[in-house]
Amino acid sequence: MSRQPVRIEPLEARHARAVLGIYRLGIDGGDATLETEPPTWERFTATRMPGHRFVAVDPGDGGVLGWVACKRVSDRGAYAGVVEHSVYVHPDARGRGVGKALLRALIESTEAAGIWTIQSGIFPENAASLAMHAAAGFRVVGTRERLGRQHDRWRDVVLVERRSPAIV
């Protein structure tokens, strides 16, 4: 992996193996998700919104460094402008601004589409993700205590959201 600035591209089927591999690394790391297995590619693409999913690519070798994608929180019309997102960065690419660049791309695409709120759940132990989200304009809404079990222990999840100042 080079240390050059990353390139952001739309997430496409050709990225499937790398994206699901990074998802797997997040699961194995223990502080990214309550999931125990990555979804199939078919399920991944069926549940994430087209036009609002991106990969960060290393301009040196073309490798995928991370990804971001979102899905609607509800099919009710009142929540049409509210999405939940996930952002994952390969462990070897952390500290390079990959997550920040991915969040910026997601914010730009969702605002252009009239989406007014982006939210996510983050484990309180994931200080780097909480800091990155705060720097991108997300605020902590609250903590959902004992939301789910992981490896025989209850996990809390911090709910963060970003309300777009561009959508009034």
Residues of each region from the PLM?
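A short beta-loop-alpha structural element at the N-terminal edge
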Residues: 6-19
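Conserved catalytic-core motifs of GNAT/GCN5-like acyltransferases
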Residues: 69-72, 77, 121-122, 134, ...
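Conserved beta-strand-loop-alpha-helix junction that forms the acyl-donor binding cleft
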Residues: 94, 120-130
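Conserved GNAT acetyl-CoA-binding A-motif
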Residues: 110-122
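Conserved acetyl-CoA-binding loop-helix of GNAT-fold acetyltransferases
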Residues: 95-108, 130-135
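Helix-loop element at the rim of GNAT/NAT acetyltransferase active sites that forms part
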Residues: 13, 21-37
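Acetyl-CoA-dependent GNAT
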Residues: 32, 36-92, 103-104, 109, ...
